């Protein structure tokens, strides 16, 4: 019995002497005392040498000592596991009062934002979006739009030609022709897209974006056009702008006008061009100009974006400078 008490105390002392409450070291002691070759296991095996009369009492005493040591070990194990968990939780604790981590998300390009803004406004008025090819034929880009052969827009210094009949479109007006060929009035469409002109400076780039509108119906008139553009410009810029229509010339509209808005500096700023669809254009697509009339509008997306966000250099839209683009998120 004395031997058993000493063994229990020895086991407890070994457990207490473990440094840093190591669970690995604790498991080594468990194996040493309670494993297949452990001290208590060996004592149980030695019972075979004890007489049958003494064996039950001796076995009970060994089990009692073993249970006392094992309970002490398990208690320490539970205590140390909880301490380890508490330490881990303390290190991983989150201060919910701290601001969240900033998530770097992408954003729409300012040109895309303008396209969405324009198309949303006109779609609510019944205009649908139509698209067309960017590599266009001479007919759809010039001839069908009443642009004569000698017009300077056809020159190499203005237009990117592949051959005498194919070019990169200089305007999305070809979409209007294609739409009028396949649809009968009333027609109410908008044509956003990329266009190309051989020019590059602070206010021009070889590729830019344009949105054109076409409305064809019986009794379409310039008064409707003016009212539509007044409403659009005030909605787009979110200001009660002063708007001016100046007489101008475009081969595909007659009469034609350029539209200006009054800037904050007291100067007029050109924003778009418009006019009544020329009768020759209607005839080219098989629409009787004596029965139907229409108006068309052309606007440069980058131009509108520059005015809305006070951008001074058109080239900034194409340089992918995050310092610039982040201002529009």
UniProtKB/Swiss-Prot annotation:
It catalyses: tRNA(Phe) + L-phenylalanine + ATP = L-phenylalanyl-tRNA(Phe) + AMP + diphosphate + H(+). One of its GO terms (biological process) is phenylalanyl-tRNA aminoacylation. Gene3D superfamilies: Bira Bifunctional Protein, Domain 2 (3.30.930.10). GO terms for cellular component: cytoplasm. Mg(2+) binds at residue 254. One of its GO terms (molecular function) is phenylalanine-tRNA ligase activity. Binds 2 magnesium ions per tetramer. The keyword ATP-binding applies. It is found in: Cytoplasm. Keywords: Aminoacyl-tRNA synthetase, ATP-binding, Cytoplasm, Ligase, Magnesium, Metal-binding, Nucleotide-binding, Protein biosynthesis. InterPro entries: aa-tRNA-synth_II, aa-tRNA-synth_II/BPL/LPL, Phe-tRNA-synth_IIc_asu, Phe-tRNA_ligase_II_N, Phe_tRNA_ligase_alpha1_bac, Phenylalanyl-tRNA_Synthase, tRNA-bd_arm. Tetramer of two alpha and two beta subunits. Belongs to the class-II aminoacyl-tRNA synthetase family. Phe-tRNA synthetase alpha subunit type 1 subfamily. This is Phenylalanine--tRNA ligase alpha subunit. It comes from Haemophilus influenzae (strain ATCC 51907 / DSM 11121 / KW20 / Rd).
């Amino acid at each position: 019995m004395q031997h058993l008490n000493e063994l229990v105390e020895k086991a407890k002392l070994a457990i207490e002497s473990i440094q840093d409450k190591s669970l690995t070291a604790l498991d080594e002691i468990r194996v040493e005392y309670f494993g297949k070759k452990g001290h208590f296991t060996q004592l149980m095996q030695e019972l075979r040498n004890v007489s049958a009369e003494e064996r039950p009492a001796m076995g009970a005493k060994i089990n009692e000592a073993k249970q006392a040591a094992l309970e002490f070990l398990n208690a320490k194990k539970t205590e140390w596991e909880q301490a380890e968990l508490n330490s881990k939780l303390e290190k991983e604790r989150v201060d919910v009062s701290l601001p969240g981590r900033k998530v770097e998300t992408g954003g729409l390009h300012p040109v895309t934002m303008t396209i969405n803004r324009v198309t949303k406004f006109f779609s609510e008025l019944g205009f649908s979006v139509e698209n067309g090819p960017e590599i266009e034929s001479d007919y759809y880009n010039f001839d069908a739009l009443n642009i004569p052969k000698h017009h300077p827009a056809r020159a190499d210094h203005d237009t990117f030609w592949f051959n005498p009949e194919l070019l990169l479109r200089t305007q999305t007006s070809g979409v209007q022709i294609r739409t009028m060929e396949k649809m009968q009035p009333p027609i109410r469409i908008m044509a956003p897209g990329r266009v190309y002109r051989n020019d590059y400076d602070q206010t021009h780039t070889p590729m830019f974006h344009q949105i054109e509108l076409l409305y064809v119906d019986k009794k379409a008139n310039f008064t409707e056009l003016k009212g539509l553009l007044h409403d659009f410009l005030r909605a787009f810029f979110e200001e009660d702008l002063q708007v001016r229509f100046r007489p101008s010339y475009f081969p595909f509209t007659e009469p034609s006008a350029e539209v200006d808005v009054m800037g904050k500096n007291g100067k007029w700023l050109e924003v778009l061009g418009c006019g009544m669809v020329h009768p020759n254009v209607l005839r080219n697509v098989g629409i009787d100009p004596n029965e139907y009339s229409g108006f068309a509008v052309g606007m440069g997306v980058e131009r509108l974006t520059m005015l809305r966000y006070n951008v001074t250099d058109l080239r900034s839209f194409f340089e992918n400078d995050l310092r610039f683009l982040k201002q529009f998120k």
